[in-house]
Amino acid sequence: LPDCQGWMIAKCRFSLGNRKMKTSDQFPLQILKKDGRLAKIHICSFAGEEKDLLDVTLINPGQRMTLGSRENMETEKEDYPFKVTREETDRYLREVKDQNPIHQGEGAIVPGFLMANKILKQLSPQIPFQAEFRFLTPLQIERSGWLEFLSSDEENDPKIEAEKALKKVQKIHLRTPQNIILKAEITEYKE
């Protein structure tokens, strides 16, 4: 949205069905709510029984955006390191024609969709799937973090065990030493 320059993604949810996308697919955009601090957007496409959708909540951070301390930001967990380079960001910005000033220049922050795409690429979920991301704190370009995979507290719950036959759920945090950057839940549906 052109009048949302400088705004950030607070959360997004998307679902992908089993079908192949076509360039002729129509994805109408609906603005569900918009004021000076918040915008809720819904994009949906139906093709037969399949439904692909994207829900996005944008926030205007104003002057209150905090990035955390730069000290110790380069330390990372070795298991699942996560870092977005300037080169990756510039390529992404060119491809999607993103001109949001918060992604430009010194101290720029990583675009939310770029983080989500990179996490999904690393996990390679099986289609169909649904992914939800909550962005809690901005991540600066070239700052290191790591992915933390959370175990379910309901491991021995019979209802949860029965649901596992139908779907696989992964809960993930993207962290730095100072902050949780985002929380994600990826649900893969078994056929």
Predicted regions mapped to residue ranges:
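Short beta-strand or tight-loop elements
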Residues: 129-131, 143-145
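Hot-dog-fold acyl-thioester-processing enzymes
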Residues: 1-19, 62-130
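Beta-strand-rich interaction surfaces with strong enrichment in secreted/lumenal proteins
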Residues: 135-137
